[in-house]
Swiss-Prot record:
Pathway in which the depicted protein is active: Lipid metabolism; fatty acid biosynthesis
GO biological process: fatty acid biosynthetic process; secondary metabolite biosynthetic process
Active-site residues, record numbering mapped to chain: C112, H251, N281
Domain comment, as recorded: The last Arg residue of the ACP-binding site is essential for the weak association between ACP/AcpP and FabH.
NCBIfam families, alphabetized: fabH, PRK09352.1
Cell compartments where the protein resides: Cytoplasm
SUPFAM superfamilies, per database record: Thiolase-like
Protein name: Beta-ketoacyl-[acyl-carrier-protein] synthase III
GO cellular component: cytoplasm
Region (ACP-binding): 252-256
Main location as per UniProt: cytoplasm
Keywords for the protein's UniProt record, in alphabetical order: Acyltransferase, Cytoplasm, Fatty acid biosynthesis, Fatty acid metabolism, Lipid biosynthesis, Lipid metabolism, Multifunctional enzyme, Transferase
Length: 326
C-alpha cells in the first residue's frame, strides 16, 4: 500500500493587526495582563476577508509550493467552525475559486482539532481509493463570533487560514494518528449560531449566547491532559523517543499550556514551535499556519520527525506523527 506524504503547504493571514494595547482601549485589560497569561502580543483580524477568501489564498500557496495544478487534486477538505454559508460548503467554494474540477469536496467541524481530523480522514480516503492527492485546509474567521466586550475571550482569538497538500508516495511520510472526542465536557467551550458584522469597532453585536464562551480552567486542564496523552500515544505507536523528534507543532492556544505540557513530558519548551504571539488562537487554522511558516523559514528538513497535536471545542483532540518529505 502507498504511503502518504505532505508535499506542499500554504497560509494566509489578514494584514490588519490588532495589538494588546488596542484591546486595552475597548475592554478592561492591558498588554502586560494578556502577554503574561497567554503569550499573545497581537492577532490578525479580518477587514472584509471572509473564510472562503482566506481558505482560497492558503490553497493557492499550497498548490504552488507542491508544484502541482489545481486539477490534480482529488479531494478537498476544509476544517472550519466559521463558514460563510451553510451551503455550498467552504470546500466547494474553494474548488470553484481555484478550478479544482476533479476534487471531491466537503467541510468538517471539529474546532481547533479540525485540521488533524482532516488529515486523518484524507489519509484514510487516499489509502483506500483511486484518489492520489488531497488538499486539507483549516480556515477561521473567529472575529465574527468573539464577544468584544469580554476581556477573557476577545484577547485570545485571531483570523487566518492554513493548508497542506497530501499525496500518495513511496517515501515514508504520515505514520500514525491518535485522536478522540469527549462530548461529555462540551459545555466548557461553546458558540451559538453565527450572524454577520461583528467587529471590535461596530455596535452590531451577536446575541450574548451566540459568542464563544469558555471555561478557561477546565479547558486548560483538558488541553494539558489531551496533549500529553496524544504525544505519549504517538510515541508508543512509532517507538520514537522525544529526542528524535525535531519539533512538536501544537495548536496555538496559550503559551502556558505548551509550557505545562513540556514539563509533563520532561522535554524542553523549545521543542514546541510557537507563533501565537503574532496570531493568537486561530482554531483549525493554527497548526497549518505554523507548519507553513516553518516550511517557509526552512526549519524543516527532509526526514525530520515531527508531531502535530491539537485540542479544542467538542471537546476534541488529535495528533499525528510525520516524517517530513519536502
Amino acid at each position: 500500500m502507498s504511503n502518504i506524504s505532505v508535499i506542499g503547504t500554504g497560509s494566509y493571514v489578514p494584514n490588519n493587526i490588532i495589538t494588546n494595547d488596542f484591546l486595552s482601549t475597548i475592554v478592561d485589560t492591558s498588554d502586560e495582563w494578556i502577554r503574561t497569561r497567554t503569550g499573545i502580543l497581537e492577532r490578525r483580524i479580518s477587514k472584509g476577508e471572509n473564510t472562503i477568501y482566506m481558505a482560497t489564498e492558503s490553497a493557492k500557496e499550497a498548490i504552488k509550493n507542491a508544484n502541482i495544478e489545481a486539477n490534480d487534486l482529488d479531494l478537498i477538505i476544509v476544517a472550519t467552525l466559521t463558514p460563510d454559508n451553510f451551503m455550498p460548503s467552504t470546500a466547494c467554494s474553494v474548488q470553484k475559486e481555484i478550478g479544482a474540477i476533479n476534487a471531491l469536496c466537503f467541510d468538517i467541524s471539529a474546532a481547533c482539532s479540525g485540521f488533524i481530523y482532516g488529515l486523518e480522514i484524507a489519509c484514510s480516503m487516499l489509502k483506500n481509493s483511486f484518489r492520489n492527492k488531497a488538499l486539507i485546509i483549516g480556515a477561521e474567521n473567529l472575529s465574527k463570533i468573539v464577544d468584544w466586550e469580554d476581556r477573557n475571550t476577545c484577547v485570545l482569538f485571531g483570523d487566518g487560514a492554513g493548508a497542506a497538500i497530501l499525496s500518495k508516495t513511496k517515501e515514508e511520510g504520515i505514520l500514525e494518528f491518535h485522536s478522540g472526542s469527549n462530548g461529555l465536557k462540551g459545555e466548557h467551550l461553546t458558540c451559538g449560531v453565527l450572524k454577520a458584522n461583528n467587529t471590535p469597532n461596530k455596535n452590531d453585536r451577536l446575541e450574548k449566547n451566540n459568542f464563544i464562551k469558555m471555561n478557561g480552567k477546565e479547558i486548560f486542564r483538558f488541553a494539558v491532559g489531551a496533549m500529553n496523552e496524544t504525544i505519549c500515544n504517538i510515541q508508543e505507536k512509532t517507538k520514537w523517543d522525544l529526542n528524535e523528534v525535531k519539533y512538536i507543532i501544537s495548536h496555538q492556544a496559550n503559551s502556558r499550556i505548551i509550557e505545562y505540557t513540556a514539563k509533563k513530558l520532561n522535554t524542553e519548551k523549545d521543542k514546541f514551535y510557537m507563533n501565537l504571539d503574532k496570531y493568537g488562537n486561530t482554531s483549525a487554522a493554527s497548526i497549518p499556519i505554523a507548519l507553513d511558516e516553518m516550511n517557509k523559514r526552512g526549519l524543516l528538513n527532509k526526514q525530520d520527525k515531527i508531531i502535530l497535536v491539537g485540542f479544542g471545542g467538542g471537546l476534541t483532540f488529535g495528533g499525528v506523527a510525520i516524517v517530513w518529505s519536502i
